[in-house]
Regions:
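Catalytic cores of nucleotide-sugar-dependent glycosyltransferases that transfer UDP/GDP/TDP-activated
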Residues: 1-591
Length: 591
């Protein structure tokens, strides 16, 4: 071949090479533009849905509030009427019974006149009142957290989730909280200060408190703000101070004083963890004969590990008798006999004790040695109930989730593949719906977790691994929707609720720890666990990650059947958790 021909041939090759490069660059550019367009469409979708929600909320506020909010606000207005001496306790109780009657459309009647002054509203209440039948339980939570107003751990989600579920089933629920300086008031509607001080007992004398009321998700909330002891709740953190006993015993006593002053006569006073356990002995030793003869006490424990052990003489601060309570069958600590145990007070003095656990049975909890309460729990075992936590199925539902590029359900799973590809794009992973995607989602509050995950990513050096060390609401929804498998440190996850949400979104929850899998073989022959624990043990507990991947690859029909079945199960707050609580309320009201 001549040199000219060789030169011409080489020129053609370089020309083809440059054209190929240009084509690759063009395709990459088009890919980037397509991704940007997809991201833009998703952002517009979220923005549009947010706008629709905003318009619907505005329309709701401008026309008529929902019946729960109207009822809650009306109850708080009645409290204010009692505190300002407009009405007496007896008439207030009659009005509350009227509101509780689900057969009376009181929300429709009062929605247009809630703006009126208390004196005018009272005239309407008296005009409207008549024969009514009480159809549900009246429950007052005395607690230290409520989502989204003040959230530290699982208690906040529990109080809000359970309260909303109870109200949807026809029960009346109220919440009493300390007025912390760090409250998130964005979701508190109609926040107002009651124009009257009320006094509560502490450390030998009466002290003034300022009362605030508002409505959170249709639930009436009362905030108690100490005046003399203003430093108790004007701090940065909620817990962790040397005088936590003083802070929360003040609040517990003030809550009871407020309930009596406002003339409330609830069916159940629902107290939580050690922080409000002192309500138990206070109720039976001081308050039961002040119009609360028909009220019963329910204690819920999110955990038995935090108990608050104190000097007996401190009980006198809130009006209790240290000598009478410092006994082994009452508040005396089981191990440090010179001290009193505040959580034990709640167990001993409550009519029912609910322990929140997804997987443990009553027998396992009683026989655990780590909490030191086993003698007390054994004595009071007949009042113990175990309930699994739920989750908010209205916020975590792939069929209507506004954060997803395409919605899907157990009846139509097509959208899940689109969610997986979208997640892969977001994380810069290879985009292919058939690639198995498994995720570990944990809490940054777990000691050393971030460091361990960063080390794991560095050691693995795998282009298909991503570590994200901050929470993003939209991404959390997409991760659940785009994953095939969710690796869970535990199925007893009361904070992030990953196993519950994973099943809802069609991702298989798999335990990280083989020890936890082995514990799934333990069966309490005397006391059965929850429906949730039974379902999880039968379907997911004994499946290691390798087996799950093998099943997904080689037996997809079996995998799909299992996933779809899990998606159809209802493990929300409205289901088993709420039913267990209603049964417990019914049991103690019959005592």
């Amino acid at each position: 071949m001549r040199s000219g021909e060789l030169e011409e041939k080489g020129t053609d090759i370089w020309k083809l090479f440059r054209e190929a490069q240009q084509n690759i660059l063009y395709l990459n550019k088009q890919r980037i533009m397509a991704k940007e367009e997809l991201d833009r469409v998703k952002r517009e979708k979220i923005s549009l849905l947010d706008r629709i929600e905003q318009l619907e909320r505005t329309k709701l506020i401008n026309t008529r509030k929902d019946k729960f909010s109207i009822s809650a606000e009306l109850l708080l207005r009645i409290d204010a009427m009692v505190l300002t001496s407009l009405i007496g306790s007896k008439e207030a109780s009659e009005f509350r019974r009227l509101i509780m009657d689900s057969n009376v459309s009181i929300a429709d009647y009062f929605s247009e006149i809630m703006h009126k002054q208390d004196t005018e509203l009272l005239v309407e209440l008296r005009h409207f009142s008549g024969k009514s039948r009480k159809s549900g339980y009246h429950v007052i939570h005395v607690c230290t957290e409520m989502a989204p107003v003040v959230s530290v751990g699982s208690l906040a989600l529990y109080v809000t989730g359970l309260s909303r579920a109870l109200q949807r089933k026809g029960h009346l629920v109220e919440v009493i909280l300390p007025k912390y300086a760090s409250l998130n008031l964005n979701e508190v509607h109609g926040l107002r200060e009651v124009d009257a001080e009320f006094h509560s007992y502490f450390n030998g004398q009466l002290h003034g408190n300022r009362i605030w009321t508002g409505v959170v998700y249709g639930i009436g909330v009362t905030f108690i703000e100490p005046l003399y002891y203003s430093s108790f709740f004007s701090r940065e953190n909620i817990y962790g101070y040397s005088n936590d006993f003083e802070r929360f015993s003040y609040f517990s006593r003030a809550s009871l004083d407020y309930i009596v002053k406002a003339g409330k006569q609830p069916d159940v006073l629902h107290i939580h963890n050690w922080e409000t356990s002192i309500v138990g002995p206070l109720f039976w030793d001081v308050f039961v004969n002040q119009g609360l003869e028909g009220t019963r006490i329910m204690l819920t424990c999110q955990s038995l590990e935090s108990q608050c052990v104190e000097q007996p003489e401190k009980l006198a601060l809130c009006g209790l008798d240290p000598h009478g309570l410092h006994r082994s069958d009452r508040l005396q600590d089981n191990h440090k006999s010179h001290l009193v145990n505040v959580l034990k007070a709640g167990v001993v003095y409550s009519n029912k004790v609910i322990i929140m656990s997804s997987m443990q049975t009553k027998g396992q909890i009683i026989n655990a040695t780590i909490h030191g309460l086993e003698p007390t729990l054994t004595i009071h075992k007949d009042k113990l109930v175990v309930a699994p936590p739920g989750f908010d199925s209205s916020a975590w539902d792939p069929s209507v989730d506004k954060f997803l590029p395409q919605n899907y359900s157990a009846d139509n799973m097509k959208g899940k593949s689109a969610c997986k590809v979208s997640l892969q794009q977001h994380l810069g992973l290879q985009e292919q719906a058939s690639i198995i995607l498994f995720v570990f989602m944990g809490s940054g509050q777990t000691p050393g977790l971030n460091t361990a995950m960063e080390y794991f990513e560095e050691e693995l050096k795998d282009e298909n691994t991503r570590f994200l060390n901050k929470y993003d609401e939209a991404l959390a929804h997409l991760v659940l929707a785009g994953s095939d498998i969710m690796l869970c440190p535990s199925f007893d996850d009361t904070v992030l609720q990953v196993p519950l949400k994973a099943m809802r979104y069609g991702a298989m929850p798999i335990l990280l720890n083989s020890t936890d899998r082995k514990s799934g073989h333990f069966v309490d022959r005397d006391l059965e666990g929850s429906k949730f624990s039974g379902y999880v043990k039968d379907n997911f507990t004994n499946i290691p990650l390798s087996q799950a991947i093998d099943e997904l690859k080689n037996n997809p029909s079996k995998w799909d059947k299992k996933i779809v079945d899990a998606m159809t199960k209802d493990f929300s707050w409205d289901a088993e958790c709420c039913d267990i609580h209603i049964s417990a309320y019914a049991a103690i009201k019959n005592l």
